[in-house]
Amino acid sequence: MIIKPKTRGFICTTTHPVGCEANVLEQINITKAKGPVANGPKKVLVIGSSSGYGLSSRIAAAFGSGAATLGVFFEKPGTETKPGTAGWYNSAAFDKFAKQGGLYSKSLNCDAFSHEAKQKAIELIKQDLGQVDMVVYSLASPVRKLPDSGELIRSSLKPIGETYKSTAVDTNKDLIIETSVEPATEQEIEDTVTVMGGQDWELWINALAEAGVLTPDCKTVAYSYIGTELTWPIYWHGALGKAKMDLDRAAHALNDKLSATGGSANVAVLKSVVTQASSAIPVMPLYIAMVFKKMREEGLHEGCQEQINRMFHERLYRADGAAPAVDDANRLRLDDWELRDEIQQHCRDLWPTITTENLSELTDYREYKEEFLKLFGFGIESVDYDADVNPEVNFDVEQF
């Protein structure tokens, strides 16, 4: 079939398998160009490995460190008449290139929140790898099915305490608008912590530890975003921020456990990037368009892959073997470049001056739109979008 982009709200409802493969190859090449990771991991489990920072982590481990990788994700395969999700095609492409490079790659397409996913991952690790020396936790989901009761819990992107009003961009119409979001109820806050907090990360690490499939020096990392005062009301000071604070709680508990044998658990605070997850957050597209332009001008711009490669090389697996620099909450900070005073002051000054008319001139909004479509495999120069493509792509994945 011939596949063209169709967007609805903050998602693109179509995806292009050849475009997704081109994206993955680009990220692999960025990683290879950075050179090998000294003392890097060799057997890595990535929970949430099909897009965004999770996919970048799997690529960094495999193509930066020569690691065997097991990826866990929840994606839809394509059918004769309908493309699959971008994450399906990303994972298929990763698997293809990993195997071409002689690297072990297996994937589980399932609900990562379930007990079954954890058991299946443990079985595969025991059977094929023995133990893993790194576990990356990178799930971004609006819903969690509680593994014991089967109850569906939903997260909320809402402020706490008062209605949030701000300038934003309507990415469908390319218009600057005023947006307002009603505050979360106590129940919504609690539910957001249940879905996006640290509980499932703990369940994973505890299950893996009890099964004896973690090396004594295993490192685990989960991803967070803190941002700045421009995004705090909807993010860090909102319901999602409470969930990310719970991730910090889990990191401390897990670090106490793993450090006893020489392992570690950290939250890594990452920079804002164009992902399916960030595009759903009010204000983020406009903030990203502003901050990207300034960071590009300053030579500080990083995409998902560059950011994760820096985490591997300069934080977790330093060539000198030194412990990584952490903040006062034991977090790895990769948002340090974005948070530089001159970058943030520029955004604060620019924010009130943005109009529909000057949006493309004063920010990288056009680039934001291009990056967004690229997530789904569109707008890539090397791809012929008038060519017939097969939406059914199979690879080494177990589904349950």
From Swiss-Prot:
Binding residues annotated for substrate, in chain numbering: Y225
Binding residue positions for NAD(+): 48-53, 74-75, 111-112, 139-140, 244, 273-275
Catalytic activity field: a 2,3-saturated acyl-[ACP] + NAD(+) = a (2E)-enoyl-[ACP] + NADH + H(+)
UniProt-listed Enzyme Commission number(s): 1.3.1.9
Keywords linked to the UniProt accession: Fatty acid biosynthesis, Fatty acid metabolism, Lipid biosynthesis, Lipid metabolism, NAD, Oxidoreductase
Record GO biological process: fatty acid biosynthetic process
One GO MF term: enoyl-[acyl-carrier-protein] reductase (NADH) activity
Annotated positions for site Plays an important role in discriminating NADH against NADPH: E75
The protein's annotated pathway: Lipid metabolism; fatty acid biosynthesis
Domain of life per record: Bacteria
Short name of any one Pfam family annotated for the protein: Eno-Rase_FAD_bd
Catalytic center residues: Y235
Function: Involved in the final reduction of the elongation cycle of fatty acid synthesis (FAS II). Catalyzes the reduction of a carbon-carbon double bond in an enoyl moiety that is covalently linked to an acyl carrier protein (ACP).
Similarity-based family: Belongs to the TER reductase family.
Assembly with partners or alone: Monomer.
PANTHER family (alphabetical): ENOYL-[ACYL-CARRIER-PROTEIN] REDUCTASE [NADH]
Protein name: Enoyl-[acyl-carrier-protein] reductase [NADH]
Species assigned in the record: Shewanella loihica (strain ATCC BAA-1088 / PV-4)
